[in-house]
C-alpha cells in the first residue's frame, strides 16, 4: 500500500469519482456486489495500489451494467470506437491463441457483455460466441436452442405457454426455444450461471446481447481483439426462422460480418485489422458461405461416435485423411472436442490419437475445446493444476489455440512460459531442472 501522505494520482482521483457515482447509481445491485464495493472503497480511500484500483473500476462497470439491465428494456452499449486500428496494439500471432469460450464465463455468466469485457481485460486474443436467431430474425449470442438452463425464463409467467417440443439434431427436446421469442422478449430475460459450483452473484444482472452488440465490444477494445462466432444449429434455425427474399441464417450471419468490416483471408492485412474465425459443426454451412466471404473458417468436431448435425455422418468418418484433404479447400483449421484427440479412461489420459499430426500435415490449425479450471474437469494426470493441462496441450500435443472458460489463467500461463525462455518453456522441464539443482546440494 502507498503511505497515506503520498499525493493522490490521476487514476486515484478518477476512480474516486467513478466509485462514488457508481455506488449512487448502483443502489439496486445485489447486496453481495454492493458489499464487494464497500470493501473496494476502502482501497482507494487509503490510496491503494493501481492493481486494486483497476479491479475496483472493473466492478464499477458491472454495477453500471446492473443498473441499465434493471431499469431499461435493453441495455446500453457503446458504439464501436472510431480509433484507428493502426494505433492499437496488434493481435499477437507468435503463440497459440487464447480463445475466450463464451467470454470469461468461469467468472461471469456466459455470452454476456460483462463476460466478454472481462475476457478482453484478462488478455483474450479472441472472444468466442454462439450465434442463434430470434423469432423475428435478429441474431443473438446464446449457446442453447432452449432458454431453460441459463436464463430466468421460468420466472416469467407471461411466457408459461411458450414451452414446446421440437426435434433437434435427430432427438426430441422440450423447453422454451429461442426461435419462439422476439428480440424484445429475449431482452426482457436475465442470464444466469450454467454451473452451480461457479459464482452465482451475477445471476440476473445481465441480458442476452445481439451479434451486433458483441461485435461492438470487440471493436471498442483498446487493442485489436478477434471475434470467433459460431453458426449454431443452422439446420434447426433455418427450419424455424424465415428471412425476406429467401435469405438463410448463413446469409444474415455473413451480412453482419461484412457490414462491420470483417473480411480477408487468414493473416492478410484486412484480417489482421479485424481478426475473425467463423466456426460451425455443420460443414455444409461453411461450404455455403465460402462463396460469400474469404474470412477463415474452422470446422468443429464432436465426439467420434456422434452424427453430424447436417449430413448424418460420423465424426470418425469426417476426420479421415480424405475428408481433411477435401475440407481444407474451405477451412483453415478444425476445432475438436479435446477428448477426441486424447481419449480419457477413468479420468486418466490414454495414448493420444494422431488427429493433430494429420491435421497439421494437411496444413490445418487445431483449436480444441473446452479447458476449464475446476477439478471436476481436470484429468487426474494434471493433479488439479490447470497450468499442467495447458503445458501438456500446448507443448506436448502442439495445438494452435485453446477454447477456455478461464482466459486469465491461460494468459498468465503463456506470459510466464514466454518469460522463461525458449529452452525452458516446459513446466515439467523447469521442475526437473529445479530438482537437479536441489539434488546437487545433497
Language-model features and meaning:
Residues 9, 21-22:
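Low-acidity, Ser/Thr- and Arg-rich intrinsically disordered low-complexity segments
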Residues 52-442:
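Phosphate-group recognition and catalysis centered on beta-loop-alpha active-site segments
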Amino acid at each position: 500500500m502507498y503511505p497515506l501522505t503520498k499525493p493522490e494520482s490521476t487514476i486515484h482521483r478518477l476512480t474516486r469519482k467513478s466509485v462514488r457515482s457508481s455506488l449512487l447509481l448502483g443502489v439496486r445491485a445485489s447486496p453481495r456486489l454492493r458489499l464487494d464495493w464497500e470493501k473496494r472503497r476502502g482501497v482507494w480511500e487509503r490510496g491503494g495500489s493501481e492493481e486494486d484500483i483497476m479491479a475496483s473500476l472493473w466492478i464499477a462497470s458491472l454495477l453500471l451494467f446492473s443498473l441499465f439491465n434493471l431499469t431499461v428494456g435493453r441495455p446500453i452499449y457503446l458504439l464501436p470506437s472510431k480509433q484507428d486500428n493502426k494505433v492499437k496494439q496488434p493481435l499477437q500471432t507468435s503463440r497459440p491463441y487464447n480463445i475466450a469460450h463464451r467470454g470469461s464465463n468461469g467468472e461471469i455468466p456466459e455470452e454476456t457483455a460483462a463476460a466478454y469485457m472481462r475476457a478482453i481485460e484478462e488478455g483474450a486474443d479472441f472472444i468466442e460466441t454462439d450465434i442463434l436467431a430470434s423469432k423475428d430474425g435478429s441474431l443473438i449470442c446464446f449457446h442453447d436452442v432452449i432458454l431453460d438452463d441459463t436464463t430466468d425464463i421460468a420466472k416469467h409467467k407471461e411466457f408459461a405457454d411458450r414451452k414446446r417440443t421440437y426435434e433437434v439434431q435427430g432427438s426430441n427436446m422440450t423447453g422454451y426455444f429461442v426461435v419462439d421469442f422476439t428480440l424484445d422478449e429475449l431482452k426482457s430475460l436475465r442470464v444466469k450461471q450454467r454451473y452451480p459450483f461457479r459464482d452465482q452473484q451475477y445471476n440476473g444482472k445481465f441480458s442476452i446481447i445481439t451479434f451486433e452488440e458483441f461485435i461492438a465490444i470487440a471493436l471498442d477494445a483498446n487493442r485489436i481483439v478477434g471475434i470467433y462466432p459460431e453458426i449454431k444449429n443452422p439446420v434447426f434455425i433455418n427450419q424455424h426462422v424465415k428471412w425476406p427474399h429467401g435469405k438463410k441464417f448463413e446469409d444474415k450471419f455473413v451480412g453482419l460480418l461484412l457490414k462491420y468490416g470483417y473480411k480477408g483471408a487468414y493473416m492478410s492485412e484486412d484480417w489482421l485489422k479485424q481478426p475473425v474465425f467463423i466456426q460451425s459443426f455443420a460443414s455444409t454451412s461453411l461450404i455455403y458461405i465460402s462463396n460469400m466471404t474469404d474470412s477463415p473458417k474452422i470446422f468443429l468436431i464432436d465426439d467420434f461416435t456422434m452424427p453430424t448435425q447436417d449430413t448424418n455422418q460420423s465424426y470418425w468418418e469426417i476426420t479421415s485423411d480424405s475428408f481433411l484433404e477435401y475440407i481444407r479447400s474451405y477451412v483453415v483449421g478444425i476445432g475438436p472436442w479435446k477428448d477426441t484427440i486424447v481419449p480419457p479412461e477413468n479420468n486418466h489420459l490414454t495414448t493420444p490419437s494422431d488427429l493433430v499430426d494429420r491435421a497439421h500435415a494437411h496444413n490445418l490449425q487445431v483449436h480444441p475445446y473446452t479447458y476449464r479450471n475446476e477439478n471436476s474437469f481436470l484429468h487426474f494426470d494434471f493433479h488439479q493444476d490447470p497450468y499442467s493441462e495447458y503445458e501438456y496441450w500446448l507443448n506436448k500435443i502442439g495445438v494452435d489455440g485453446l477454447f477456455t472458460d478461464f482466459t486469465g489463467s491461460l494468459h498468465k500461463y503463456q506470459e510466464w512460459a514466454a518469460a522463461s525462455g525458449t529452452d525452458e518453456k516446459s513446466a515439467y522441464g523447469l521442475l526437473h531442472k529445479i530438482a537437479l539443482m536441489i539434488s546437487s546440494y545433497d
